[in-house]
Amino acid sequence: MNRLPSSASALACSAHALNLIEKRTLDHEEMKALNREVIEYFKEHVNPGFLEYRKSVTAGGDYGAVEWQAGGLNTLVDTQGQEFIDCLGGFGIFNVGHRNPVVVSAVQNQLAKQPLHSQELLDPLRAMLAKTVAALTPGKLKYSFFCNSGTESVEAALKLAKAYQSPRGKFTFIATSGAFHGKSLGALSATAKSTFRKPFMPLLPGFRHVPFGNIEAMRTALNECKKTGDDVAAVILEPIQGEGGVILPPPGYLTAVRKLCDEFGALMILDEVQTGMGRTGKMFACEHENVQPDILCLAKALGGGVMPIGATIATEEVFSVLFDNPFLHTTTFGGNPLACAAALATINVLLEQNLPAQAEQKGDMLLDGFRQLAREYPDLVQEARGKGMLMAIEFVDNEIGYNFASEMFRQRVLVAGTLNNAKTIRIEPPLTLTIEQCELVIKAAHKALAAMRVSVEEA
């Protein structure tokens, strides 16, 4: 039987939620009630699958851990008052920490004036952010399209490449094995995870995948496409594959891909949604090899963990295909004043506090600690790898990875797996993580692995 809509029920639900938003603290009974509500509503109205996922990576199979608020720049507090060091970072959005005061203040100040733009008058913050991004990014990148997420930034990049290359008879895209570029239809066509792709087949035509980090495979693909008349419009790849398991290519790989793109007249699209904004020890990961893409995709940390925003930045030559008709690709909320305020403040904090350099220093410290653990626990850990504050611990099988996440949860450290590699747990904390907190994370990992070894031996 169909359920009839109820205005009274919706009004009561919204009033209850607004009352909750106003609260700063909850007593014990309120916490228990909120936990029950959240679990019920996820099950009945969001997606029960999320509960099972959460259950697999929390202590004792308890999926009732409900986030309440930020504890500090680098910690989260749940409804039971437990504080966790955040080594997941919202999959890479909290580069400047949780509720960074500079970012929050910028958004609050803009909120007091005008939250969203009229769409008809020119909005100053979008102009200022575009100018700032042009100054920040490498090479000839000059014009920015702002959106709301990473997958949208990739969609814009693909459409931009198509618009530029179609008159030249180039329609093919080359992506890489293990890649993750998002889950909208175009971005999913470049993503290389069958689990995400198969339910939505057929995807966009013209996409080919080659092994990541294999420059000869890239050359062969470009050659074959040229021979068959399927000339390549663009190569799209991540400088370091995040969801693929924090996979680093061989030194010189990006430089070699850039040369191949120039040789074959293909555009180079770099997806720095996860690696950008200081995460790897440089503002952008491509700067480790001084590589300059034709199109750059940003999102996640660009909004400072306060507002969602993505960006697609291109050279004037490429972006000029949109000059005659700027409405060829637009979005209602992209580049809104609140998001632009957050992004401007985020860039300011990253530069003022030199957080990319801090990411390199602290990342080296953490990675040294994890590699030492890999040597101590070779029966459990296959490898620790990373660059800057984007790291991964790969285990000998999938189950051990899940167990490690659960044990770290018991140690009050949040970690999680990568979407394309179940054996791998990512370590992606805020760049503001303190040295003391870095040491606590390494100690927690040691305790987690020791407990896991005991469990294996007892079994």
Swiss-Prot record:
Catalytic activity annotation: an alkane-alpha,omega-diamine + 2-oxoglutarate = an omega-aminoaldehyde + L-glutamate; putrescine + 2-oxoglutarate = 1-pyrroline + L-glutamate + H2O; cadaverine + 2-oxoglutarate = 5-aminopentanal + L-glutamate
BP-aspect Gene Ontology terms: L-lysine catabolic process; putrescine catabolic process
Keyword Transferase tagged: yes
Keywords linked to the UniProt accession: Aminotransferase, Pyridoxal phosphate, Transferase
Listed pathway(s): Amine and polyamine degradation; putrescine degradation; 4-aminobutanal from putrescine (transaminase route): step 1/1
Gene3D superfamilies assigned: Aspartate Aminotransferase, domain 1 (3.90.1150.10), Type I PLP-dependent aspartate aminotransferase-like (Major domain) (3.40.640.10)
Binding site for pyridoxal 5'-phosphate: 150-151, 274, 332
Modified residues (N6-(pyridoxal phosphate)lysine): 300
Cofactor(s) listed: pyridoxal 5'-phosphate
EC number: 2.6.1.82, 2.6.1.29
Keyword hit for Transferase: yes
Membrane-crossing residue ranges in chain numbering: none
Enzyme class at the top of the EC tree: transferase
Pfam families xref list: Aminotran_3
Function: Catalyzes the aminotransferase reaction from putrescine to 2-oxoglutarate, leading to glutamate and 4-aminobutanal, which spontaneously cyclizes to form 1-pyrroline. This is the first step in one of two pathways for putrescine degradation, where putrescine is converted into 4-aminobutanoate (gamma-aminobutyrate or GABA) via 4-aminobutanal. Also functions as a cadaverine transaminase in a a L-lysine degradation pathway to succinate that proceeds via cadaverine, glutarate and L-2-hydroxyglutarate.
Family: Belongs to the class-III pyridoxal-phosphate-dependent aminotransferase family. Putrescine aminotransferase subfamily.
HAMAP family, alphabetized: Putres_aminotrans_3 (MF_01276)
Name of the protein described by the UniProt record: Putrescine aminotransferase
Organism encoding this protein: Escherichia coli O8 (strain IAI1)
Chain's gene name: patA
